[in-house]
Amino acid sequence: MREVLLESRDDRQHVYLPEKCIGCGSCVQICPKGELVIGSVGAVARGLIDKDFIEKKRSGACVLCALCARVCPTGALELRTAGKAEKDESYLNAALQPTTVNDKCVHCGLCVDVCPKSCIEILDRQLAEDGSLRMEGKTIIDLARCVHCGWCAQVCPTGAITYQKPFAGQFFRDDNICQACRTCVHTCPANALFNKEGKAAEMVEKVTHRKDACIYCGACQEACPVRAITVSKSAIIPDMKGKKALEKKLSAPAARPTLTSILKIDEDACLGCGNCVIACPVNALFDPYLAAGHLNELDEKPLLEVLNGTVRVVDQQVCGSCATCSMICPAAAIWLERREVA
């Protein structure tokens, strides 16, 4: 697993494990020095930019207090002393009860089918050889990748799986602001958001929330390019040392993402089709005609516009770093590149 050394001081190291990170921003929210930065969450989740969810400033203000590591639900941040990670009852990831499978398991594979992180597998699955009508095998959960969403337990027909969520909370999406860009759907680590399939002329929600799967991490909020989503953490569920103090800090408004990417355009490759202008959720929020997919008036937009047959960036600062433009471009003429954090 890839490791990023964020800072080293004497025999202590601040280490980031990007493959475990879900882009929730809890670490950024709780950092007392503002040393951690989150940005381009949607683009990172979609695999459309070469960067990680989290970066660290180089101001030297970090005091290695370990608060960021303590609230990380997946163990993506570590404070190490002499190379050994600090893990005790004051760390949320260590306090979380592991997702486990007991002897009631019939190895049916439903949990494998629904796991959003593909961290469950069944080994040596075969019909029992004792004459009974049952399956034998081993159902294995990779705890390093499990996000404790509970999908597996919810679909298990025998109640063989136990789990514990990291947070309790509330989810709110403003339908008047949401542009149905699907950035939140692609980002959610728990598959708790989806788009319903509607029939002709049927009114359906732009995005539907699966409450029972949500872990209230806040990754969707960090990813939304138009700030249509608010996730609040009301409680830390596992018993852990210093829980009340951490809950108080996490009850504050979540940290807003930093612009950690920059839009790039290949003018020679651009067809001037305007697909990116129409699909851009920031543009669509500004202009309801674009949200309806109208192909006219492709100039005078807040972020992207077509001028003289070529797309151009109007204002980098309003970009939500979702990379929807990059996804829809038929000529690969627009993309996001990493922007250095001061």
Question: What is the predicted function of each stretch?
Answer:
Residues M1-R2, I30:
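DNA-contacting interfaces and partner/effector-binding or oligomerization modules
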Residues E3-G23, V41-L64, G83-H107, D124-H148, ...:
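Ferredoxin-like iron-sulfur electron-transfer modules
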Residues S26-V44, L67-A85, L110-L127, W151-P166, ...:
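Iron-sulfur cluster-binding cysteine motifs and their immediate structural context
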